[in-house]
Amino acid sequence: MAGGGRAAVGRRLLMAAALALAAALSYGLSDFFGGILSKTRSVWMVTTASQLTAAAATAIIALAAPGDPGPADFAWGAAAGIAGAIGISALYRGLSRGRMGVVAPISGTGAALVPVVVGLASGDNPSPLAWTGIVLAFPAIILVPQAGGKRAPVATGAGYGVVAGLGFGALFALIGQIGTDAGFLPIALTQLVVAATVASVAVALHQPWLPRGRGLAPVFAFGLLGTAALVCFLLATRAGMLTIVSVIAALYPASTVAMAAIVLREHIGRVQFLGLALAAIAVVLVTVG
């Protein structure tokens, strides 16, 4: 009986790691295609339209697989939406004023660190092997977005990177607080709040945000990747420890870099390759541990 129980726990943890990895892949692909779409469209419009699409798709999933969410679950979902919008807005502002090699690593580190702290405070107790993977994940997160060329001053965009990291980290941590029987409606609210908040920021900055014109189909498809990412992450938190699944999900820049190399033939430098290798080792250790 004890052996069967341990096997069931092992399968559950493996499923959590697989779902977190699927979330990381979806987030990475979302960033890749979002970056391409934003070259010809307003990033604020792309974000607003994609989040509205994601909210609608998640609501459909919620109707197909209903749960029993309470007021607290919707409160966590709404708070996560505000945090996510802060993260997105700060990231875009940081990338427009500083270098990706400064902003992205700082934001990625914060996205992993905040839920790790929250998970540990909530009683998560990873194994020594999993801890090794968690420790390796942080340099991977920092190294993967690095590009060659001149190094920018660390202060350039660093403040926005910190705010973005805190926002994304809070998003992960808050999603992890949604009840296991709450279904998916709370995260549909998350995406709706992100869309409304980002649109409000765009209005305040006098930036175009309203989806209009032709060629919106790719933007809507981009939104479905956001649905997949958030649904997979929510399911991962229900199957495993927030400490572990958030670290795996925060490795999403690795899939963005890999897609850029495969599709756009962008060169992967030695530093980035080291980051990708560390990310792969971290995922294996966290999963096995």
Residue ranges and their predicted role:
Residues 45-49, 102-106, 131, 185-189, ...:
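Signature of the 12-TM Major Facilitator Superfamily
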Residues 13-26, 67-84, 124-139, 183-195, ...:
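Structural signature of hydrophobic alpha-helical transmembrane segments
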Residues 37, 46, 94, 99, ...:
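Hydrophobic/aromatic residues within transmembrane alpha-helices
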Residues 3-25, 33-34, 38-79, 89-98, ...:
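Membrane-interface interhelical linkers
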Residues 155-185:
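Selected transmembrane alpha-helices and immediately adjacent juxtamembrane segments
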Residues 58, 113-118, 129-146, 271-288:
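Hydrophobic transmembrane alpha-helices of multi-pass small-molecule transport proteins
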Residues 52-58, 106-120, 193-197, 229-232, ...:
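Alpha-helical transmembrane segments of compact multi-pass small-molecule transporters, enriched
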Residues 27-28, 54, 80-88, 111, ...:
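Transmembrane alpha-helical core positions of polytopic small-molecule transporters
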